Amino acid sequence: MKKLSILIFVFVLSPLMAFAQAGHEYSPLVEKTVNYKNWSLTSLTTDKADDLRSLVAGKKLVMIVYFAPWCGNWRNEAPIAAKLYEKYKAQGFQVIGVSEYATRDDVKKYFGDAGAPFPVVTESETRDDKQKTLHYGYRQLTGDTRNWGSPWNIFLEPSKLNASSDVLTEKAWVVNGELIEDEVDKFIASKVTATSAVITPCKN
């Protein structure tokens, strides 16, 4: 009986262990109810307000990634996000970063003299703001139980967004952790290219 209990325990934990590899927090792409709202947040480069509707206009697919620049898991994902953006931006794919829990100066230092490879805006600047952010609220809705939730990724299809409502979309594809590159690459391709094989990520 003891051996059976151990086997069951290992079986239950094995999927979690597979996603938490060597300090990574990989998470699958899933469709969730999120009630994602339009926003107007300050651009890291211009110090002016950027409206989300304007940023996504004319795009086929947009990945919004919420991140804290000091977070190791974000630093794991950052080159993947930049790579996917470079690969598909000519086909209508856009990445937008939303910085959290760090000052704008710290975010600028993180990206260095070259700057961010895609548009970045700021939602919060201190760790004390964690539970006050929309980022935190969305994470609760999508079942993200991590402490800081960095990175947290949501995919929007501009052609399907509500044209006038404050809520842009009730449901969206999200990743509650680091991107699984192959999975997300295929998903992006299925949305921005006509000839790519369509992948159907798991729904729950």
Give residue ranges: language-model regions.
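A short beta-strand-turn-helix
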Residues: 36-62
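Hydrophobic beta-strand anchors of alpha/beta hydrolase catalytic cores
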Residues: 63-64, 95, 153
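Sec-exported extracytoplasmic/periplasmic mature domains
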Residues: 57, 76, 83-90, 112-115, ...
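N-terminal targeting signals for export/organelle localization
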Residues: 1-43, 189, 197-204
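Conserved segment of the thioredoxin-like fold in thiol-based oxidoreductases
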Residues: 86-133
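Thiol/disulfide oxidoreductase modules built on the thioredoxin-like
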Residues: 114-116, 125-187
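Second-shell loop/turn segments in exported
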Residues: 66-70, 96-97, 173-174
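Conserved redox-active cysteine motifs that mediate thiol-disulfide chemistry
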Residues: 66-83
